[in-house]
């Protein structure tokens, strides 16, 4: 998070307008502009743990990470700068939450890439903070309005639910595969052996569907789940509870908060961070797995077939095997051996 995103570059064209403002930054915070922009005061709220890690180093307690913002998170702010995410329901959850807390009269700026659908902010906020487009550059739009009416926000109304083979999956806006089990995860699930035992870590757990499906036919596994996304962490906790499955769930930037070693690490790693393509998380997962696998333990991941993971697996573990594949996806398996440890 050093180079500015196109959305931040558009905001910088108006930097003089923010010098006397007390700003709350929120939404898809892909860089550290909240810490660097010259303002009277700055706060940031994010649902992404890895974004909070970067911002908290520079902003301290003025950077907050949670599913739902509180009054303390927006205290004394007179301006909201909201970075539009690629997921419209996620934007609605976050904006209704924030606008329910900010006082009437707050200046509202919404910025985002055109391809993210930022123009739909006008309709979404029409009843609360009518927006006008004030700038267009770098394939982004910047919108401005003033809060005229606070919405009523109820986080419980944003929960969704679906069933997979008799399992209940709880979801929230912004969680991967919110509307159903994705094809890649289905392929990975098909490879999991019944009656498995030992400690299992689910990295990038999303709604927790991989873990509860695994636990159903391998009830003796001990589950740990982690994700960078606050909605994913809460959804996974709810999914485990709905299916009577025990497990520890917490926020982590891949392995940043993970302690100890496991007999198996499973993952359907992301290759996007917001609107940006990024293989960093998956490569960090593969390279870091050797520090969190017991001897003989395995890493098992599913990925789009075109992604360049075989080389990283071979560099890290000394070898890998493809244990299932379709035209679009492959399931990779790598075993923790002495050769991998030496690597």
UniProtKB/Swiss-Prot annotation:
Main location class: cytoplasm
Pfam families per UniProt: MTS, MTS_N
Catalytic reaction equation(s): guanosine(1207) in 16S rRNA + S-adenosyl-L-methionine = N(2)-methylguanosine(1207) in 16S rRNA + S-adenosyl-L-homocysteine + H(+)
Gene Ontology MF term list: 16S rRNA (guanine(1207)-N(2))-methyltransferase activity; nucleic acid binding
SUPFAM superfamilies: S-adenosyl-L-methionine-dependent methyltransferases (SSF53335)
Annotated EC: 2.1.1.172
Identification of the protein by name: Ribosomal RNA small subunit methyltransferase C
Source organism of this protein record: Shigella flexneri
């Amino acid at each position: 998070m050093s180079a500015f995103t196109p959305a931040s570059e558009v905001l910088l064209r108006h930097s003089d307008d923010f010098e006397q403002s007390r700003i709350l930054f929120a939404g898809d915070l892909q860089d550290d502009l909240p810490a660097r922009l010259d303002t009277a005061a700055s706060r940031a709220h994010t649902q992404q743990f890895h974004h909070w890690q970067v911002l908290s180093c520079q902003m301290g307690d003025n950077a907050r990470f949670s599913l739902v913002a509180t009054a303390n998170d927006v205290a004394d702010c007179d301006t909201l700068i909201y970075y539009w995410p690629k997921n419209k329901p996620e934007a609605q959850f976050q904006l209704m939450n924030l606008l329910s807390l900010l006082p009437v009269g707050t200046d509202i700026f919404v910025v985002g890439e055109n391809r993210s659908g930022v123009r739909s902010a006008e309709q979404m906020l029409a009843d609360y903070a009518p927006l006008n487009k004030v700038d267009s550059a770098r394939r982004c739009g910047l919108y401005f309005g003033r809060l005229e009416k606070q919405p009523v926000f109820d986080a419980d109304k944003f929960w969704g639910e679906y069933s997979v083979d008799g399992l209940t999956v709880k979801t929230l806006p912004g969680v991967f595969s919110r509307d159903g089990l994705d094809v890649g995860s289905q392929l990975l699930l098909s490879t999991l052996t019944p009656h498995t035992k030992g400690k299992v870590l689910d990295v990038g757990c999303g709604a927790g569907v991989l873990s509860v499906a695994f636990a159903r036919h391998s009830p003796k596994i001990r589950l740990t789940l982690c994700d960078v996304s606050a909605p994913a962490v809460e959804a996974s906790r709810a999914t485990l509870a709905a299916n009577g499955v025990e497990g520890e769930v917490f926020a982590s930037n891949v392995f940043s908060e993970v302690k100890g070693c496991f007999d198996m690490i499973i993952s359907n790693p992301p290759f996007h961070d917001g609107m940006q393509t990024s293989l960093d998380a998956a490569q960090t997962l593969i390279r870091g797995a050797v520090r969190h696998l017991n001897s003989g333990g395995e890493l098992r991941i599913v990925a789009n077939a075109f992604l360049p993971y075989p080389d990283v697996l071979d560099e890290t573990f000394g070898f890998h095997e493809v244990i299932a594949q379709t035209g679009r996806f492959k399931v990779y398996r790598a075993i923790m051996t002495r050769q991998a440890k030496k690597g």
